[in-house]
Amino acid sequence: MADLSSRVNELHDLLNQYSYEYYVEDNPSVPDSEYDKLLHELIKIEEEHPEYKTVDSPTVRVGGEAQASFNKVNHDTPMLSLGNAFNEDDLRKFDQRIREQIGNVEYMCELKIDGLAVSLKYVDGYFVQGLTRGDGTTGEDITENLKTIHAIPLKMKEPLNVEVRGEAYMPRRSFLRLNEEKEKNDEQLFANPRNAAAGSLRQLDSKLTAKRKLSVFIYSVNDFTDFNARSQSEALDELNKLGFTTNKNRARVNNIDGVLEYIEKWTSQRESLPYDIDGIVIKVNDLDQQDEMGFTQKSPRWAIAYKFPAEEVVTKLLDIELSIGRTGVVTPTAILEPVKVAGTTVSRASLHNEDLIHDRDIRIGDSVVVKKAGDIIPEVVRSIPERRPEDAVTYHMPTHCPSCGHELVRIEGEVALRCINPKCQAQLVEGLIHFVSRQAMNIDGLGTKIIQQLYQSELIKDVADIFYLTEEDLLPLDRMGQKKVDNLLAAIQQAKDNSLENLLFGLGIRHLGVKASQVLAEKYETIDRLLTVTEAELVEIHDIGDKVAQSVVTYLENEDIRALIQKLKDKHVNMIYKGIKTSDIEGHPEFSGKTIVLTGKLHQMTRNEASKWLASQGAKVTSSVTKNTDVVIAGEDAGSKLTKAQSLGIEIWTEQQFVDKQNELNS
């Protein structure tokens, strides 16, 4: 047994060494086959002799048993966000504030990795817990998934108690490989590596996460007590020595001009990196100066994040195609000569509507400027008339639906053309796709191509038919083996237990979004009560305006829809609200039961963070100001909502007043 113990230790050392060379140094000394052979040997030993399996064994990287859910855990120290800078003027103002408070300063510039912020806790040198950022105060425990990332040491080189923070991300080559696999399996593709990383880390089965080949860069440590570091740069060097991966493309600079040079360098070189970045983080380098400057409620005063502007490129507009959405809206899409934008190849981009095409004088054959809105969604910004070829073609929208041939109409007050044929095949298929989507019934495995096959085979004609599908229906479909069929049927069965708001949103009632679906489900609790409501009742509810009220009542009064609901009931699809009622939340009297509207730009938190916090205190956050609104929180550049609130005599708070009230409650 002594020989076996020695071999286990040897395998640990070899596998950890090879893993570090491959994933951290990007310089492997052995082929993958050698690593796999040694890992398989260790797995076999641990299966036959469980006493040799340790918490830091390299076999942990493979993943373990699937979890039922992720636990919510409070951060020992809040994970704060950074203030943003979008241009040189913002950066110079930041520099001026710094120098006014602490005098001369050295900055540390680091690449802002486009991934998911994580916190890693080590006890006696062992990795014991990993959390997502969450809302900054509470994150999700994704320890088992993080253990599969080779760049995260399971055991530090010294037995310290420490919490480090970093950015988990998906390298571009892993992202391309993952999407190729998803395309083969007729699954929805990830839009970008960031979404792919976030989705991978939230897999309940860590074995799936292990296959995604994620990585991580560590950028900070919570407590410097055990560190011989006087600066951010020295702290990163210490983290390297302990076995953590930090980004090497960092630089110390003496002034704001050095910061601007660093930004200029990486703005031009960002595409050469094997991972996505979306900006630059600038920090005061000296740790004592950081302590002197301190924090606001939401961010450190000694750091700021410069965000890259959306990249614009020029390519050729080859054609314009039309798509019909589930509500009949006909949307033009630009077919482009493939071009790389913000790290991915783009061959299609949104043109939104006919008015935009004409207003921007966009013609087929033009050279056009393309960018990704928010570095995600490609859109055509403008044409370049001076480069227009003689044979460029002015585009005119059709008069009839390209799917069903029905005449297209433009409803008063709308810019979009719409097909109003309720039996239009394109709309019906889009409605089915919407019904199974994540925010609706969330039926995993029922992708677009499978739905199209099922519809064309006349196996499903409406959303209720999904719950009547059998193994015999699914097995003959393309790329549907026994395992995929079993998984899909299980997902369909699971969807029957969704809460009422999922069903309401999934039905695709025009104007009824996710939030309004939640409001109605919570208010009426069952579908049967909803079937009896009137427009007059609905318009009295916050967040349910005239259009939504009319649309919901008209939809639910339709006899075909009532028959559809009965068809769903016959298959035991849940029609009851399962969530927590806002009225049951015991919040602070300052907020509980109040209707609050957020307007304008917030600097110390995002609108989403503010909304979540208010909801946690029992407040109802609405999007419009009415006589029933109790408070309006007005950020920078608040517009018509603030004006309306003033005219109605509604109480108005500035962002700072709101933050002060939060601080009072937290103290």
UniProtKB/Swiss-Prot annotation:
Task: Tell me which GO cellular component terms the UniProt record holds.
Answer: cytosol
InterPro entries xrefs? BRCT_dom, BRCT_dom_sf, DisA/LigA_HHH, DNA_ligase, DNA_ligase_AS, DNA_ligase_CS, DNAligase_adenylation, DNAligase_N
EC number(s) given by UniProt: 6.5.1.2
> What are the record keywords, sorted?
DNA damage, DNA repair, DNA replication, Ligase, Magnesium, Manganese, Metal-binding, NAD, Zinc
List positions binding NAD(+).
32-36, 81-82, 110, 133, 167, 283, 307
UniProt xrefs under SMART domains: BRCT, HhH1, LIGANc
Cofactors that this protein relies on: Mg(2+); Mn(2+)
What is the name listed in the Swiss-Prot or TrEMBL entry for this protein?
DNA ligase
The record lists the organism as: Staphylococcus aureus (strain COL)
